[in-house]
Each structure stands twice: as C-alpha cells, then as structure tokens.
Amino acid sequence: MTSSKLTLEPNAREELLDHVREGASRDPPAEVCGILAGTGNTLSRILPVSNVADEPRVAYELDPQETLTKIESVEESGDSVLGFYHSHPESAPVPSATDREQASWPGYVYLICSPDGRMNAYEWTADVFEPLEISR
C-alpha cells in the first residue's frame, strides 16, 4: 500500500457488510474472511474465502487452495490484491493477539469488520498494524 488511506466503493462496502452479518447470524457466530481487490488504494470488490479455522467463532484461517484460486482470478481480471479481511462478530474491529501472531503479508491491507458496520483498516508492516484512514 502506498497510501495511508483506503477508499471503499459503495458496492464493495455493502457486499463486505452482508458477508460479515451473515457470519454473525450463524449459531454460533463465526468469523468470515476473504480477499480485498481493486486498484491503487481503492477497494472495488471482495472475494469471500472459506474460514477453515478450528475455532471459527474466535479465529479465521483462509482456505489455502481457495485463496490461491481467487488470487489468480483477481490478477487475471487486471485488478490487484489489496489485502485481506475478516470479521470480529462479537468484539471490536481491532487486531487481536491472534491476528498479530498470524499476520504474514507485509505491505497488504488487513480490514477488520464488526456486524454493526464498524470497520478498521491496517497495513501490516511485518512488525505492527499501522492504521489506515477509510474513506467512502
């Protein structure tokens, strides 16, 4: 990411919140996750990916094969992978200790969302999550 700001196109924001709310409505609630795609610092679409974590209520793990397939489709479309998203269905949209331990894509956006519509974006620097401004 070359900017300290992430712009969300309205359709991408709505798709994202729909996915987050769908996960939160499960019994028990589950974190959802996926890929952020667009150009520059503008998020134009999301690509949901199955959460294969052992405890999806409190953790996420992107399905590796599905992630690879979707990354290839983003690249073939001419868009770029901007980063990844996941939800916190029962807590604030801030990086947890687990999020910090598992972050592995320096320079990419990590977007964390809550079902109530709150969301925060960060760039992982390989050491810390640097907050990004979100604009609509």
Predicted regions and their residues:
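Short, well-ordered beta-to-alpha junction loops that form the rim of enzyme active sites
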Residues: 87
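Conserved beta-strand-loop surface patch within small alpha/beta domains used
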Residues: 1-81, 90-136
